[in-house]
Structure formats: C-alpha cells, structure tokens
Amino acid sequence: MAKTSPVVPPIKLSEPTESGNDTTETSGRLKHLFRDQPLIPIGCAATVGAFLFATRAIRRGDSMRANRFFRYRVLAQAATVLAIVGGVFMERKMKQEKRMEQITPK
C-alpha cells in the first residue's frame, strides 16, 4: 500500500494592491512604484543616464565633460536618496494619520 502525501495549498507570495493588481509581475510593480513614488524611478534613470554619458565622454577622451557628468550623477543620486527618505517619512505620516482616524471617535 503506497502512502499518499497530503495536499498542500499553494502559497500566495504577495497580496493584491489597493487597486486590485497583483504586484508579482514586473509591470505591476513598476506601475505601483511610479504611482506611489514617481521621483525614485526618475532619479534612478537620471543617475544611470549621467553615468552612461560620463562613460561615453571617457571613451572619447573628454575628461572635462566626463567630470561634469559625474557631478550630475552625484546630484541625481543625492536627489534620489532624498526622495526615498522623504517617501518613507510621508508613508509613515500617512499611516499614523490613518491610525488616528480609526482611533478617534466621530
């Protein structure tokens, strides 16, 4: 007599977002990120762009232009980090306000 293993239900790795979309797909995650924190992907793209232009300038031997683009990269990175920190604080503030609305009687 062969033993049968119990049937295990599948594990759901992520919960649907407020809009009902599943965030496991890349396009869903990107849409969610652009909607909630649009400055972060823009800052990342600016950082990568500045780095690529600096690399191109180095290959062409234009060190002054390369240094200028490296400075732009640093500024773009700083702006991205500030956007991340600001987003974290805003998210925390929104959660606290939502919690206070639930606690406070009307």
From Swiss-Prot:
Keywords of the record: Membrane, Mitochondrion, Transmembrane, Transmembrane helix
Annotated region (Disordered), positions in chain: 1-28
InterPro entries on file: Hypoxia_induced_domain (IPR007667), RCF1 (IPR050355)
Membrane topology: Multi-pass membrane protein
Pfam families associated with the record: HIG_1_N
Transmembrane segments: 39-58, 73-90
Comp. bias (Polar residues): 16-27
Subcellular location: Mitochondrion membrane
Key word rRNA-binding present: no
Coarse class of the protein's main subcellular location: mitochondrion
All copies of domain HIG1, residue ranges: 9-102
Gene Ontology CC: one annotated term: mitochondrial membrane
Quaternary structure and interacting proteins, as annotated: Associates with the respiratory chain complex III/complex IV supercomplex.
UniProt record similarity statement: Belongs to the RCF1 family.
Function: Cytochrome c oxidase subunit which plays a role in assembly of respiratory supercomplexes.
Name this polypeptide is given: Respiratory supercomplex factor 1, mitochondrial
Gene encoding the protein: rcf1
